[in-house]
Amino acid sequence: AAAAPTLMEELNISTQQYSYIIAAYSAAYTVMQPVAGYVLDVLGTKIGYAMFAVLWAVFCGATALAGSWGGLAIARGAVGAAEAAMIPAGLKASSEWFPAKERSIAVGYFNVGSSIGAMIAPPLVVWAIVMHSWQMAFIISGALSFIWAMAWLIFYKHPRDQKHLTDEERDYIINGQEAQHQVSTAKKMSVGQILRNRQFWGIALPRFLAEPAWGTFNAWIPLFMFKVYGFN
């Protein structure tokens, strides 16, 4: 969104075409979230999270190759598909590393990290555009994601495999989790069971109502401020 004014000017993209680019990202993100969650369960948090982060890095960097709104829509759709794993993976890591009674504060800190990233990214993107080009903004973002993915692969370990934990710390984490998290062979819920679960709808419905506002602000506010109020 921070790059939208520059992209629209240099690639001659209309507001309607920009909306298609946003829709491509949002649709891919939405469809891929349950798929990404399944992949994370199959591959595990460490490998699954790293795989999606590398894909995000590749697709983000490849956005620099786009020469039209159609190319941008394809690239951003691919980014959305890879990014769909980030919140499920973060929550899964939180569930692995914190007992149930401390899960809320763990997720709170996870959200703080997401917010800090969202705060840092726009100035970084604008700096790259002003100092270099809009293509460089996507290349830098992709490179940083790749570095992070490598660091994740090196440093992240499940509590069972983390040698720096004492036995007491490890037992505190694992024994404080729900029963299904204590054994790797626990039976997973089916899609039907999830959809019949009232707790699922208690989470899903507020998100369904909140996401349109968040998505609109995130995608359109920078462009609105640029066109209506003349922000640079």
Model segments located where?
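Helix-loop-helix hairpin linking two adjacent transmembrane segments in secondary transporters
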Residues: 110-163
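Cytoplasmic helix-loop-helix junction between adjacent transmembrane helices
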Residues: 75-114
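Conserved MFS/SLC helix-loop-helix module at the cytosolic interface between two early adjacent transmembrane helices
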Residues: 31-70
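Extracytoplasmic gate region of multi-pass secondary transporters
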Residues: 197-232
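Helix-breaking motifs and short loop linkers at transmembrane-helix boundaries and internal kinks
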Residues: 12, 44, 65-71, 82, ...
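Short amphipathic helix-loop junctions that connect adjacent transmembrane helices
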Residues: 2-16, 219-232
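Residue-level signature of mid-helix packing/kink "hotspots" within the transmembrane helices
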Residues: 26-34, 118-119
